[in-house]
Amino acid sequence: MEKYNREEFEEVIVDIGRVTKVVKGGRRFRFTALVVVGNRNGLVGFGYGKAKEVPDAMRKAIDDAFKNIIHVKIKGTTIPHDVEVKYNASRMLLRPASEGTGVIAGGSARPIIELAGIKDILTKSLGSNNSANVVRATIKALSLLKS
């Protein structure tokens, strides 16, 4: 496992969820956080954290994200080729785009694409729009790219 300089990376919170457990004395709340980190130069990762308080969940998610960093192959400002990936019920389609197109991505796929440093890309999220699964499908698709 490589050590990364955390100052070089940006963090984006994709999703914060609240989970409720009903007990005899009332409701107990716990929080989950889904975070994406990237250096806008080919390194990107995601992490998932759970805790009783939101800041603790975010910290755990950021720590987890640095353990799951992948290197993305970038060709100019876009990706080298089309890729389609399925993760659980989510399908993700990534296509290279000509220069000047910009990032065409919705929901939780956009921060991953931007933090990876890709400037021009077409993406389509098919099937489930569960943010955790879309993030995992996008990361899986980016990891399958070959230069």
UniProtKB/Swiss-Prot annotation:
Keyword Ribosomal protein appears in the UniProt entry: yes
Record-level GO BP terms: translation
InterPro entries: Ribosomal_Su5_D2-typ_SF, Ribosomal_uS5, Ribosomal_uS5_bac-type, Ribosomal_uS5_C, Ribosomal_uS5_N, Ribosomal_uS5_N_CS, Ribsml_uS5_D2-typ_fold_subgr
Summary of the function given for this chain in its UniProt record: With S4 and S12 plays an important role in translational accuracy.
Assembly mode: Part of the 30S ribosomal subunit. Contacts proteins S4 and S8.
Comment on protein domains: The N-terminal domain interacts with the head of the 30S subunit; the C-terminal domain interacts with the body and contacts protein S4. The interaction surface between S4 and S5 is involved in control of translational fidelity.
Protein name according to UniProt: Small ribosomal subunit protein uS5
The species this protein was found in: Campylobacter concisus (strain 13826)
Organism placement in taxonomy: Bacteria, Pseudomonadati, Campylobacterota, Epsilonproteobacteria, Campylobacterales
Gene name per UniProt: rpsE
